A protein has these predicted regions:
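Short acidic (Asp/Glu) and glycine-rich catalytic loops that position anionic groups and cofactors
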Residues: 219-220, 286-288, 329-332, 440-448
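Conserved catalytic-core segments centered on acid/base and nucleophilic motifs
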Residues: 190-194, 198-201, 354-357
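Hydrophobic "anchor" residues on beta-strands that sit immediately upstream
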Residues: 99, 103, 200, 251, ...
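Conserved alpha/beta catalytic core and glycan-binding cleft of carbohydrate-active enzymes
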Residues: 111-144, 148, 237, 241-421, ...
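Active-site rim elements
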Residues: 176-177, 183, 227, 333-346, ...
Length: 561
């Protein structure tokens, strides 16, 4: 299948598959996934029907933050393979009509990057101004900004007596985008990969690149209001876009930290001057009571619907968003919002339908398409994620939370929940590796695995395959406006998508009991066609505006004008 480089809007009907390479497939016995492992599974991804693969970082890195600390933008981490392996992946994916999107981190580099190593301890280094250095204030840090990973965001360079800024780990030094030389380096890096044939880029925390230049302390927060969606961020993105993205026809998705709808309308504006689309995470905080992640709490269903409505109506005709539940930082959605025991298959399908029928570009995270669950670890020794082990130390040893309570919280909230190895088959270690996996495989792999899913036409896999097909076949999914039909209903999430010719209804029961609802009379359900549902005998129930839905049932109905 040939792919034209400048088919500008291919991503509007596309579905993108996210691969976290470390946990996807090991081609040998080292216990960590690699590029050759990805190549070996391309036929599986072709069968699923995805249009593109987004790879989390595979660059040279000390791996302090899972590769988001890049020490060489022009090299592949030997843990994942060689540049030759990468070129093979690119060629074989393209042959199957699958595009490749690379994850690029340009807010910061690893402190092992040669730019930083040259800058460290030498105020006269040509690379000193590639980073953000400040003198102490009153013998201490330049301001009170906090790192996203805890603690102060400044680290002292003893040799020069100045501090450098790190919004993430101290091993991740923020780049100084005010320096035009930095922006030229970024253009060169992106051009290098685009020249190879890489089709697009996911830009990590890209809305943090412009800092308020007086670097004020924050008397009411952690400092984020002074660097989030900062003063020159749109100018910088337009500069990079014009120089590189527009030249190559790259698809671009910006990860937006703590952003607003208004900024995202501009980042992803339909004139294409900045980015193709944006990721935001507001809907994944509905189980953070008062913004607190590390608690066991039910999710706020009404708030979830309100957030979807805000972003769907706000981006319609103005911008473009990514649609997703899962990634390498979030727990498995079927464990989080569904029922991963009694109704695992039903709830996995319902949750998929409820985001895939919205406007935007859906992202499927590895294993989501087979209904993989959180692993339910019971010992802290099973965890590898630094955020999780740090929080265990703080909450158990400092705050007095019991071991049992903290294990229950981690079992719900840890990032390792989504990083367990991909479950390929029912053989040892789920067919992920011939060695010992870097992170323990979830115990349910003999039941939940790709081989079993592909063999069962009623599996979660084929439901995802159908959702991916529908986006290409039904125009209203791409261009229809969005309306939440039952915003106050405590159990049902039901919305309409409408254009001049079609009305699509997506009706979802988010709970484990039978629930009824009445849809507005203006929708003529007697004319509706049942496009897809997750129960075998839903067709007869379609014709009435009075709907009765079984546990975790979803119905996707189409009315042609």
């Amino acid at each position: 299948m040939a792919m034209t480089k400048h088919d500008e809007s291919w991503w509007k009907t596309a579905t993108i598959y996210q691969i976290y390479p470390k946990s996807f497939c090991d081609s040998g016995s080292k216990g960590t996934g690699d590029v050759k492992g990805i190549i070996s599974k391309l036929d599986y991804l072709k069968h699923l029907g995805v249009d593109a693969i987004w790879l989390t970082p595979v660059y040279q890195s000390p791996m302090v933050d899972n590769g988001y600390d890049i020490s060489d933008y022009y090299a592949i981490n030997p843990q994942f393979g060689t540049m030759e392996d990468f070129d093979t992946l690119l060629a074989e994916a393209h042959q199957l009509g699958i595009r490749i999107i690379m994850d690029i981190v340009v807010n910061h580099t690893s402190t092992e990057h040669h730019w930083f190593q040259s800058a460290l301890g030498d105020k006269n280094s040509p690379y000193r101004d590639y980073y953000i250095w400040k003198d102490p204030v009153d013998g201490a840090e330049p301001n009170n900004w906090q790192s996203k990973f805890g603690g102060n965001a400044w680290e002292l360079d003893d040799a020069t007596g100045q501090y450098y800024l790190h919004l993430f780990a101290k091993e991740q030094a923020d780049l100084n985008w005010e320096n035009p030389a930095v922006r030229e380096e970024v253009k060169e890096v992106i051009s290098f990969w685009a020249d190879k044939g890489v089709d697009g880029f996911r830009l990590d925390v890209i809305n943090l690149i412009s800092k308020q230049q007086d670097f004020p302390s924050d008397d009411i927060g952690d400092g984020r209001r002074f660097y989030t969606d900062g003063p020159r961020v749109h100018e910088y993105l337009q500069e990079i876009s014009e120089a590189v993205f527009q030249k190559y026809g790259s698809v671009t998705v910006g990860e937006m930290s703590s952003t607003t709808l208004e900024h995202c309308q501009q980042y992803s504006s339909l004139d294409g001057k900045e980015l193709s689309m944006v990721f935001n995470f507001h809907h994944l905080k509905v189980d953070y009571p008062n913004g607190e992640k590390w608690t066991k709490a039910p999710f706020d269903f009404i708030q979830l619907k309100q957030i979807f409505n805000h972003w769907q109506t706000g981006l319609n005709g103005k911008g473009w968003g990514a649609l997703f539940w899962c990634n390498h930082d979030q727990p498995r959605v079927v464990s989080r919002l569904g029922d991963d025991k009694q109704y695992r298959v039903e709830s996995a399908k319902m949750l998929a339908a409820s985001v895939h029928m919205m406007q935007g570009t859906p992202y499927v995270y590895q294993g989501e398409e087979i209904g993989m669950t959180n692993p339910g670890y019971t010992e802290i020794s099973q965890y590898r994620d630094v955020e999780s082990t740090n929080m265990y130390d703080i909450m158990v040893n400092r705050d007095g939370v019991s071991h049992e309570d903290m294990m229950a919280i981690l079992a719900q909230k840890s990032r390792d929940n989504s990083r367990t190895p991909m479950q390929w088959n029912s053989q040892k270690h789920a067919g992920f590796t011939e060695g010992t996996p870097w992170l323990e495989v979830a115990q349910n792999y003999s039941e939940i695995n790709a081989e079993a899913a592909v063999a069962d036409l009623n599996s979660v896999f084929y439901f995802y395959k159908r959702l991916i097909e529908l986006r290409k076949q039904v125009p209203v999914i791409t261009d229809g406006r969005y309306e939440d039909l039952l915003p106050e209903h405590q159990r049902i999430f039901s919305y309409a998508r409408q254009n001049d010719k079609q009305t699509l209804l997506c009706i979802n029961n988010y709970y484990a009991e039978e629930v009824e609802c009445v849809l507005p009379e203006r929708f003529e359900l007697s004319k509706a066609k049942n496009l897809l549902s997750n129960y075998q005998n839903s067709a007869s129930a379609v014709a009435s505006n009075h709907q009765v839905l079984r546990p975790y049932e979803t119905r996707i109905l189409l009315i042609e004008e």
